[in-house]
């Protein structure tokens, strides 16, 4: 049996789908890196997660030796720190700002050609703090840093996708 309410929902769904298609929306697929092979030096949690994501989400081959790679992703810095944002009326810390900063660049294997000049990504998260919940707040801090690391990996991959060979000499 035909009902006005059911057909209006179907019409609304069709209009919504047409609007989404018209604006260019599409689900995120594979990240197509502009390199056939990539070397990522280092042995830390950020590098491990970055390698996992590149291997899973692109056709780019990860290599162990920089000489075998079309591109080398080098890190210039990786810093995590915690800054006091506010104090309570009793003079105790009540809020922190967590910061995660990573600097990196992408060159060819010889370092002669720069695909992505030295870049820096800074992520921050605010965290309320209480002396009564020290263990819980330590766990929350670790969780926030892991979350920032995941975000960092995604942002680095987005920048790698946008990288183009350039003829800028390395400083």
Predicted regions and their residues:
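A structural "domain/chain start" motif
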Residues: 2, 6, 19-61, 165-171
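Classic N-terminal secretory signal peptides
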Residues: 11-19
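Short secondary-structure boundary/capping segments
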Residues: 29-30, 64, 113, 119
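C-terminal/domain-edge helix-coil "capping" segments
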Residues: 135-171
């Amino acid at each position: 049996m035909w009902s006005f309410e059911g057909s209006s929902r179907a019409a609304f769904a069709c209009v919504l789908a047409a609007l989404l298609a018209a604006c260019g929306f599409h689900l995120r697929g594979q990240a197509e890196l502009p390199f056939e092979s990539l070397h990522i030096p280092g042995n830390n949690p950020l590098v491990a997660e970055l390698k996992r994501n590149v291997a899973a989400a692109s056709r780019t081959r990860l290599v162990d030796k920089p000489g075998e790679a079309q591109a080398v992703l080098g890190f210039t810095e990786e810093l995590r720190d915690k800054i006091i944002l506010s104090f309570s009326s009793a003079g105790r810390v009540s809020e922190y700002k967590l910061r995660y900063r990573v600097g990196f660049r992408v060159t060819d294997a010889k370092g002669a050609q720069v695909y992505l000049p030295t870049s820096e990504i800074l992520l921050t998260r605010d965290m309320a703090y209480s002396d009564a919940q020290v263990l819980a707040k330590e766990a929350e801090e670790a969780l926030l840093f892991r979350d920032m690391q995941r975000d960092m990996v995604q942002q680095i991959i987005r920048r790698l996708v946008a990288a183009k060979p350039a003829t800028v000499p390395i400083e």
